[in-house]
Amino acid sequence: VCLYFIQKEDISDADALRQIHLATGLTHNHLRCHIASGLYYFIAKAIVTMAPKNADLKTCIQYGLEKGFAFYHTPESLAELMYFQRLRDLNEFFSLPEDEIESDGYVLHALEAAIWCLLHTNRFRDCLLRAVNLGDDTDTTAAIAGGLAGLYYHYEAMPQEWVNAIRRKAWIKRLCLQEL
């Protein structure tokens, strides 16, 4: 859903996020989940717009988080934003040891774990392996980290043996190339 709205230049962030929140709400209809989805949107948008201009991944993530925190700096969201406090200073967050990163599938932990993996690796493969090796809810953490890593490192950076193992690969490629 985020990628669909990122490529739509005629829609505002506020309108895109209303739709993203509706999609998030299908399974996780809580403001904290909406904020996490929104932060993901802003990070993904920063990667898509800044990486082609040679911005490093940390800069893209920082910019996306700043945009997200500014967007959600509203009276109704302030109490929930405190839960995302560790992500406000990426240098401090980067310095956290692995045993302080939770990967239990809880929305906040999943986003933090994905960002931590992105910051501690410099290749698509390494990022996903790091996410999986955190343990617990590995599919959630790897899906979030992998989506963002894929945007930054691109399809060509994916290990060929992983790409070859994808089921219905031709259908997925066609879907990705279609205008939705």
Question: For each of these PLM feature ranges, what is it?
Answer:
Residues 138-150:
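Conserved phosphate/anionic-ligand binding catalytic regions in large, soluble enzymes, centered on
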Residues 151-180:
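Conserved glycine-rich phosphate/nucleotide-binding loop
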